[in-house]
Regions:
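Boundary regions of SH3-family modules and the immediately adjacent low-complexity/disordered segments
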Residues: 2-58, 64-66, 70, 75-102
Length: 102
């Protein structure tokens, strides 16, 4: 699951998930690769960062994808081996003002 690190102490990280639950984990339990989770109604994974782009997959709430990059209001993600674009507001795991480059 995607988590946000909200505090650090030595080798421990306090994390928060998309539902707001918090806890401490050892840093070795965390991956350096970012993930996001679809948090709203069914969304279409699109071929380009545009509402008019061809749909590549239909994603249900709770689907997790690998975060590749974000450009403006869109994020490029990989879900089950399919690369595509989702609107940033439709996922949890990346902040609205955060720059993400691949």
């Amino acid at each position: 699951l995607p988590v946000e690190v909200v505090a650090e102490f030595d080798t421990w990280r306090k994390i928060r998930d998309h539902e707001g639950a918090e806890g401490w984990v050892h840093q070795s339990m965390l991956s350096g690769r970012r993930t996001v989770i679809v948090t709203v109604a069914v969304r279409l994974l699109r071929s380009e960062p545009s509402e008019s782009a061809a749909p590549m997959a239909r994603l249900e709430p709770g689907v997790i994808g690998w975060l590749e990059s974000c450009r403006g209001g869109w994020c490029e993600v990989e879900v089950a081996g399919i690369d595509g674009w989702l609107r940033r507001v439709d996922v949890w795991g990346v902040r609205a003002d955060e720059a993400v480059e691949d």
